[in-house]
């Protein structure tokens, strides 16, 4: 698959096996996995890190296969969960880092362009999350308030 702002191809990777049910060797119950998800998220892990930790430490092949729900859905049912989607937060953090870099290095044209591309991705994601109802319609990204928004 191609990248968004370049003509290069993306990274190659192996595809996941298509299966709807967990493998026969997996013995944990659905409730146990959900408790582990909430516990792991409570230890300052992001939603993607939760899946990796459960895979590596506890041998959970795929949380969605076992529980029938995604990690964010499990967290929202239990009253926790991220206020903003993880991919949006990561892009905003990248934009903040680029802003700080450009404050010190005004003439760095390559990173000025990288900041423009990153903020374009943020705006595109915000538009998508407005349409799907994940973010409220009055939520707006602004570089000036981004650092305050992420620190909360």
UniProtKB/Swiss-Prot annotation:
InterPro entries: Ribosomal_uS15, Ribosomal_uS15_arc_euk, Ribosomal_uS15_N, uS15_NS1_RNA-bd_sf. Residues 1-19 have a biased composition (Basic residues). GO terms for biological process: translation. GO terms for cellular component: cytosolic small ribosomal subunit. Residues 1-21 are annotated as: Disordered. GO terms for molecular function: small ribosomal subunit rRNA binding; structural constituent of ribosome. It comes from the Archaea. Keywords: Ribonucleoprotein, Ribosomal protein. NCBIfam families: PRK08561.1. HAMAP family: Ribosomal_uS15_A (MF_01343_A). Belongs to the universal ribosomal protein uS15 family. Part of the 30S ribosomal subunit. This is Small ribosomal subunit protein uS15. It comes from Methanocella arvoryzae (strain DSM 22066 / NBRC 105507 / MRE50). The gene is rps15.
């Amino acid at each position: 698959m191609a990248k968004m702002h370049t003509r290069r191809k993306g990274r190659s990777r192996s595809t996941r096996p298509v299966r709807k049910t967990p493998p026969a060797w997996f013995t944990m119950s659905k409730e146990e996995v959900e408790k582990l998800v909430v516990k792991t998220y409570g230890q300052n892990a992001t939603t993607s890190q939760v899946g990796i930790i459960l895979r590596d430490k506890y041998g959970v092949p795929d949380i969605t296969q076992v529980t029938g729900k995604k990690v964010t859905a499990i967290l929202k049912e239990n009253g926790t969960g991220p206020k903003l989607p993880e991919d949006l937060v990561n892009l905003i953090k990248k934009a903040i880092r680029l802003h700080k870099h450009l404050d010190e290095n005004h003439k760095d044209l390559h990173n000025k362009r990288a900041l423009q591309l990153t903020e374009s991705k943020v705006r595109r994601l915000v538009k998508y999350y407005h349409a799907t109802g994940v973010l409220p319609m009055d939520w707006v990204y602004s570089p000036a308030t981004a650092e305050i928004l992420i620190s909360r």
